A protein has these predicted regions:
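Acidic, divalent-metal-binding catalytic cores of TOPRIM
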Residues: 1-139
Length: 139
């Protein structure tokens, strides 16, 4: 008996449900003959504690492997892997991060980022930029 060919999977990694809502339908239309699966990371892996340029590729790979294993897929079933991230100001110079003690949260303005903890944002941005730079050269 002839087996029907399975559709190839376009595995799209996003940070949260709002990203899936915003992009899922559009991506499904773009890859109309392919199965699009939008994987929600529930957070930003590029700033997750313990994630660095040396291990970020394997951390993302583990997410993909877990999905493949749970659905009995092999690497040949995947057509493409797309990781969509927002930069969150990762490449903004320190000079454009402003200490604002009255700010409850990060406030992105035309002149830069306003925060009540400049040092924390500078460190976060450095970690994120380093991880994003590593991911740029994958696949």
């Amino acid at each position: 008996m002839k087996r029907l060919a399975r559709r190839k999977i376009v595995f799209v990694i996003v940070e949260g449900p709002s990203d899936e809502t915003a992009l899922g339908i559009t991506l499904s239309q773009y890859f109309d003959n392919d199965a699009v699966y939008v994987h929600i990371m529930h957070g930003d892996i590029t700033t997750r504690k313990g994630v660095n340029p040396k291990n970020i590729v394997s951390k993302i790979g583990n997410e993909i492997k877990a999905y493949a294993k749970s659905h009995h897929y092999k690497s040949a079933n995947f057509m493409q892997i797309i990781h969509i991230v927002d930069t969150d100001g990762a490449y903004i110079p320190k000079e454009n991060i402003f200490e604002d003690i009255e700010s409850d949260d990060l406030l992105y303005q035309d002149d830069g980022i306003h925060t009540n903890n400049k040092d924390k944002v500078v460190i976060r941005n450095k970690i994120k930029a380093d991880n994003l730079d590593r991911l740029r050269f994958c696949g």
